[in-house]
């Protein structure tokens, strides 16, 4: 054979000339490429097949390649190899990558090696192995390479397996994991990386199964002098896999021209396994210091290496016998070992190899003039002779290069060389004696067959198709069907190879019940997603304390699924929260549709939300209280409850109705918030710019007027034409006319789309809700409020039901002009000029310059307790006949939307009261009181809420009540009430809620 080729190319080339040959055709002499072309001259040779596998160390050249070079006594594999094209590491040399060639193109002996391969298209030429044909793409994750070399002189076919156990392939696999090629561009987690390595072990086992099915002799190469106990597990796995797939292999070779026993056992004979160990440098025996290395003493009977060899043989045999890999009858074993022959060979140790130094030393030896004879031009050396010269002149020996002398460097006797060790077994094959390795009282002879090259190719091709190459075949084809069955049988390897996963699964399975118990501890019957996640986190902590290994993630996911199934199977609490931030107490259910009745027996039940929380609230005007359920939607919170009380209490009172959506189509749609809302800070600045100045800032009060001297008399004034009692808005129909431009919302209200929530500063312009969350009711005329007794309504805490006075200075036209005609009639309620008023106020001011309004900010808690506040965080307390404080402080401040209730319960949680109503007594005077409520129910970026009409002019002579919304909701969800340790001033009613404009 020209040189080593991939086994795939060898079998495909042989199949090509086998299928094209004629009955009279004769073999073509002169050799040729083994991968195709003319048929080889050795097709009728009876061959011995030797398989080589094992592990390699961190060396520049593989021990397997050096072994073949040594046994064949020629350079079959080059000493240096070009770097693997698929290898990205330019600075690391492996057996699949090197920097040059061994030998020269003009070397005659290389005609059967590297030199001849160049002309025949040999892929070994140039250092790139022919195993590239068997190499797959990185994504396929196959790092097993099979190479073949046939030595025609010795009639031995060498099969070399390079797998994940070799340094070069291990390096490629690690780089694929590091770069993400094995994970589709992503780094693999621990469990998937473990699966990757176990997959490579299974692929290696398939290649080993193939070698054990087609070889007579197998060489196990190991880079140390100690036996790797993991091979016992691998061989037991291979034996189990072989017994599993034996019927499939029989089917594959049933038509091959081989013997009956071969077809029955799917192998030419039970292969004999030999072991080659590399002696460590630490165990190398050096000669005594006073002894001349050139003249050693007489060697002892048993050298240390021989004793180590015997010890390894005994150890290996005992291990395999105990694990029943070896039995008395060799025909039933995966392999055999000889009973009366050495099956362990120890390669003498050497220092770390340096092929570059070896070549430099060889160059020196050729260039140094030693004697006159060396001046003569030497004759060209043959390939074999050239190889011997390289060995003799090398400064350091390669891994398996052994001297042919009978003495080692330590003076100990070495019985045979590596070639002699191997050839004693090869000769048994070539002489057709076979292996008689059965032991016991009744040993049964094992079958043996020495095939010709052509017959071996026929059987090996079929096995290669179904065991290795058939992974890419169509599963419907016969070959693909057999391969799929073989691959499905690989699961038998898991019990032998994946011990880590097996232990990990047992460990994780024991940890699962403990994690389940931790999850279910202290659980209510129904609970929410938050409780589920907290309990699951506790269960995972318990699980992580006991679970280990690659199955950790798998059973952690199972724990997730088990806990979720437990929760969703009748233990799932409704996730809906009320507008007061309380959970629905029902288990998972659906809401009744329009006209559908609740059904608790259905699965899931059809029920309305219910948090079992009830509170007491007053109606729009505040005169009647009633219990209310915890609301879950904005309509029930701000409209339905008050509409029910309207029929019993407030229905006959005068209202100022806010504009709402009036559809022009039968099926109006809710609007989508497509407009970009203005920044909250900008809105706040604009609103503050629009905040009106109260009377205390625009006009000065009389210094002579004191709260103690004030009276209830507000005087009688003519009705203002713009705010007279005949204004239709007083009766709830029209709008109060003001000098300001109407709002954009009022001008461009849509009749097609409605606002699904409440009106606030981030809403799209031109949209109105279907109902108003605000209410403005007139309780009666101004005189219906008694300053001394306060409001006569239910639920007020004693001493807190008073309105604060708000004194407003009114300048009449006569006083401003100062020169009235004495002949003209005085204005109503005015004195005749020239006469002083009966009551003289301080500084000579007239009493009729002052008008008094009353303002009250009412807070209400969930238990129906009501009270007024005279300022931020200040509950009103009136002990006498009326409040002493003015309303100016409250009107010029941001009033809190929530305040601590004056009557806290026994619980530790604080109890809050909410601003629900604003009472305003408008005097019958020539002035206008404009109402502009603006509420921010949370810290920024919470928007500002306001009614559908931002500025409302209150008609004179009335006791008006503005009812604030019970809940505030945006498109993103409700604005929940404050919790503990929250700044209450972030929830506020902006100052400027009232302003007075004099006529």
Swiss-Prot record:
Give the span(s) annotated as Disordered: 15-42, 83-136, 287-307, 661-734
Phosphoserine occurs at which residues? Answer: 477, 676, 750, 903
- Determine if Cell division is one of this entry's keywords: no
Q: Where is the composition biased (Gly residues)?
A: 100-120
Q: Name one GO biological process term.
A: nuclear-transcribed mRNA catabolic process, nonsense-mediated decay
Residue ranges, compositional bias (Basic residues): 298-307
Low complexity bias spans: 18-27
Composition-biased stretches (Basic and acidic residues): 287-297, 683-692
Give yes or no: UniProt keyword Phosphoprotein: yes
Query: What are the entry keywords?
Result: Methylation, Nonsense-mediated mRNA decay, Phosphoprotein
The superkingdom of the source organism is Eukaryota
How does the record describe the protein's post-translational processing? Phosphorylated by SMG1.
UniProt xrefs under InterPro entries: SMG8-like
Residues with PTM Omega-N-methylarginine: 906
- Compositional bias, Polar residues, is annotated for 693-714
Complex and partners: Component of the SMG1C complex composed of SMG1, SMG8 and SMG9; the recruitment of SMG8 to SMG1 N-terminus induces a large conformational change in the SMG1 C-terminal head domain containing the catalytic domain. Forms heterodimers with SMG9; this assembly form may represent a SMG1C intermediate form.
PANTHER family under this entry?
A: AMPLIFIED IN BREAST CANCER 2-RELATED, NONSENSE-MEDIATED MRNA DECAY FACTOR SMG8
Purpose: Involved in nonsense-mediated decay (NMD) of mRNAs containing premature stop codons. Is recruited by release factors to stalled ribosomes together with SMG1 and SMG9 (forming the SMG1C protein kinase complex) and, in the SMG1C complex, is required to mediate the recruitment of SMG1 to the ribosome:SURF complex and to suppress SMG1 kinase activity until the ribosome:SURF complex locates the exon junction complex (EJC). Acts as a regulator of kinase activity.
Task: Give the family from UniProt.
Answer: Belongs to the SMG8 family.
Write the protein's name.
Nonsense-mediated mRNA decay factor SMG8
Query: What organism, scientifically named, is this protein from?
Result: Bos taurus (Bovine)
Gene giving rise to this polypeptide: SMG8
């Amino acid at each position: 054979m020209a040189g080593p080729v991939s086994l795939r190319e060898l079998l495909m080339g042989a199949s090509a000339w086998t299928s094209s040959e004629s009955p009279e055709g004769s073999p073509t002499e002169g050799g040729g490429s083994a991968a195709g072309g003319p048929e080889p001259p050795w097709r009728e040779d009876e061959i011995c097949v030797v398989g080589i596998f094992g592990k390699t160390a961190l060396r520049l050249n593989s021990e397997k390649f050096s072994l073949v070079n040594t046994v064949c006594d020629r350079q079959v594999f080059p000493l240096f190899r070009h770097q693997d094209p698929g290898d990205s590491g330019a600075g690391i040399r492996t057996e699949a990558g090197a920097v040059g060639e061994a030998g020269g193109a003009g070397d005659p002996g290389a005609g059967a090696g590297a030199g001849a391969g160049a002309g025949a298209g040999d892929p070994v030429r140039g250092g790139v192995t022919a195993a590239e044909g068997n190499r797959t793409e990185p994504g396929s994750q196959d790092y097993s390479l099979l190479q073949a070399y046939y030595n025609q002189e010795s009639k031995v076919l060498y099969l070399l397996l390079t797998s994940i156990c070799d340094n070069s392939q291990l390096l490629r696999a690690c780089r694929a994991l590091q770069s993400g090629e094995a994970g589709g561009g992503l780094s693999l987690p621990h469990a998937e990386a473990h699966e990757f390595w176990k997959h490579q072990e299974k692929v290696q086992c398939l290649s080993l199964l193939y070698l054990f099915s087609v070889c007579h002799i197998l060489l196990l190469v190991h880079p140390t002098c100690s036996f790797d106990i993991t091979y016992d597990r691998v061989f037991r796995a291979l034996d189990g896999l072989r017994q599993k797939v034996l019927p499939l292999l029989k089917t594959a070779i049933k038509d091959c021209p081989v013997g009956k026993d071969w077809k029955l056992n799917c192998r030419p004979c039970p292969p004999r396994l030999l072991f080659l160990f590399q002696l460590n440098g630490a165990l190398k025996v050096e000669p005594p210091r006073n002894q001349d290395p050139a003249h050693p003493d007489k060697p002892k009977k048993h050298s240390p290496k021989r004793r180590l060899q015997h010890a390894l043989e005994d150890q290996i045999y005992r291990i395999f016998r105990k694990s029943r890999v070896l039995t008395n009858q060799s025909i039933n074993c995966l392999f055999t070992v000889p009973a009366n022959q050495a099956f362990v060979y120890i390669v003498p140790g050497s220092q770390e190899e340096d092929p570059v130094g070896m070549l430099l030393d060889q160059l020196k030896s050729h260039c140094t003039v030693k004697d006159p004879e060396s001046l003569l031009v030497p004759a060209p050396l043959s390939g074999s002779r050239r190889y011997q010269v390289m060995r003799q002149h090398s400064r350091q020996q390669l891994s398996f290069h052994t001297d042919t002398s009978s003495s080692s460097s330590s003076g100990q006797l070495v019985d045979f060389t590596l070639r002699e060790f191997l050839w004693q077994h090869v000769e048994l094959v070539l002489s057709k004696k076979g292996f008689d390795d059965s032991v016991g009282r009744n040993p049964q002879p094992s079958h043996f067959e020495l095939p010709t090259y052509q017959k071996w190719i026929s059987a090996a091709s079929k096995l290669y198709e179904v065991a290795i190459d058939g992974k890419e075949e169509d599963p419907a084809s016969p070959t693909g069907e057999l391969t799929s069955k073989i691959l499905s049988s690989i699961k038998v390897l898991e019990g032998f190879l994946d011990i880590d996963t097996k232990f990990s699964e047992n460990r994780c399975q024991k940890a699962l019940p403990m994690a389940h118990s931790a999850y279910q501890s202290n659980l209510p019957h129904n609970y929410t997603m938050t409780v589920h996640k907290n309990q699951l986190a506790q269960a995972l902590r318990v699980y992580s304390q006991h679970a280990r290994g690659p199955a950790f993630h798998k059973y952690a996911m199972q724990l997730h699924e088990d806990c979720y199934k437990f929760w969703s199977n009748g233990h799932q609490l409704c996730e809906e929260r009320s507008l007061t931030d309380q959970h629905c107490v029902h288990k998972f259910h659906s809401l009744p549709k329009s006209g559908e009745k609740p059904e608790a027996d259905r699965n899931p039940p059809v029920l309305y939300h219910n948090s079992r929380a009830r509170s007491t609230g007053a109606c729009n005007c505040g005169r009647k209280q009633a219990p209310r359920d915890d609301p879950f939607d904005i309509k029930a919170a701000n409209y339905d409850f008050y509409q029910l009380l309207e029929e019993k209490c407030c229905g006959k009172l005068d209202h100022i109705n806010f504009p709402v959506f009036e559809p022009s189509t039968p099926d109006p749609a809710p609007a989508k918030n497509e407009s970009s809302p203005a920044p909250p800070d900008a809105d706040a600045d604009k609103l503050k710019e629009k905040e009106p100045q109260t009377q205390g800032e625009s006009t000065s009060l009389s210094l002579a007027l004191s709260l103690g001297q004030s009276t209830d008399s507000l005087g009688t004034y003519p009705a203002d034409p713009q705010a007279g009692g005949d204004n239709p808005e007083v009766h709830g129909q029209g709008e109060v006319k003001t000098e300001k431009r109407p709002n954009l919302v009022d001008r461009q209200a849509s009749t097609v789309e409605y606002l699904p929530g409440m009106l606030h500063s981030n809403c799209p312009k031109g949209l109105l809700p279907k109902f108003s969350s605000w209410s403005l009711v007139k309780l009666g005329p101004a005189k219906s409020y008694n300053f001394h007794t306060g409001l006569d309504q239910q639920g007020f805490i004693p001493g807190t039901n008073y309105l604060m006075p708000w004194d407003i200075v009114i300048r009449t036209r006569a006083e401003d002009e100062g020169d009235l005609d004495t002949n003209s009639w005085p204005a109503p309620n005015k004195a005749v000029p020239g006469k002083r008023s009966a009551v003289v106020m301080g500084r000579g001011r007239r009493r009729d310059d002052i008008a008094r309004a009353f303002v009250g900010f009412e807070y209400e808690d969930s238990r129906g307790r009501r009270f007024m506040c005279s300022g931020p965080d200040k509950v009103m307390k009136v002990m006498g006949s009326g409040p002493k404080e003015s309303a100016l402080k409250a009107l010029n401040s941001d009033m809190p939307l929530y305040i601590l209730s004056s009557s806290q319960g026994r619980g530790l949680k604080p109890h809050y009261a909410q601003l629900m109503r604003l009472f305003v007594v408008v005097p019958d005077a020539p002035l206008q009181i404009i109402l502009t409520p603006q509420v921010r129910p949370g810290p920024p970026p919470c928007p500002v809420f306001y009614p559908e009409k931002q500025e409302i002019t209150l008609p004179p002579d009335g006791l008006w009540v503005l009812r604030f919304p019970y809940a505030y909701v945006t498109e993103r969800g409700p604005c929940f009430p404050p919790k503990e340790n929250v700044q209450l001033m972030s929830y506020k009613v902006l100052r400027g809620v009232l302003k007075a404009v004099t006529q």
